[in-house]
Design a protein with these regions (language model features):
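Disulfide-stabilized netrin-like
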Residues: 97-125
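A composition-driven signal for long, intrinsically disordered, charge-rich low-complexity tracts
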Residues: 34-35, 110, 132
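Short nucleic-acid-contacting surface segments enriched for D/E, G, S/T with interspersed K/R
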Residues: 65, 116-136
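OB-fold ssDNA-binding interfaces and closely related basic DNA-contact patches used
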Residues: 2-101, 143-144, 149-155
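Short, exposed beta-strand-loop hairpins at the edges of beta-sheets
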Residues: 138-142
Length: 155
């Protein structure tokens, strides 16, 4: 079988980017096909640790903060594969991780949260947001589905 990937990238220290349909979620934020969107470029060891920990094991779930205020400065979005409990169908959904002013991370796999962040970007431009944007976590229900969204807190 012929290798369809770039041999130079595979045989070097560079990361080979393999295009997939999962990257459609990321294309709303950037034209890059890295498999994720992160609003900051980690430069220091501390920033790299923040990114790693946020992706590997976020501090809390958004569901645990319904009705509470978070001051969002950064966001990470990555596609994840979810199996539908009813149909068994595997589908790609956005995992959204919000980062607050103190570096705490809040995550959910949610198109509602993803769409809320897209709207924030349309209005407030791309993060990092300094100062942060105060938001209140909301949960809506449609049938048996929970939908997370954000309200901007007006001061």
């Amino acid at each position: 079988m012929e290798n369809k990937y770039n041999d130079d990238a595979i045989n070097s220290n560079e990361t080979a980017l393999i295009p997939t349909t999962d990257n459609a979620i990321i294309s709303d934020f950037t034209n890059a096909s890295s498999g994720m969107y992160c609003s900051f470029v980690p430069q220091t060891a501390d920033e790299k640790a923040l990114l790693y920990n946020a992706m590997n094991a976020p501090d809390v779930k958004i569901a645990d903060h319904i009705g509470q205020e978070i001051v969002v400065t950064d966001v990470i979005i990555e596609p994840v594969q979810i199996v539908d409990d009813k149909t068994g169908e595997v589908r790609t959904s956005p995992r959204v991780i919000l980062i607050d002013e103190e570096g705490h991370t809040y995550s959910a796999v949610s198109y509602g949260l993803y769409n809320a962040v897209k709207r924030m970007v349309q209005i407030f431009d791309y993060p990092s947001w300094k100062p942060g944007i105060p938001v209140r976590v909301k949960q809506l229900t449609r049938g048996s589905y929970r939908i997370f969204t954000l309200d901007i807190v007006r001061r």
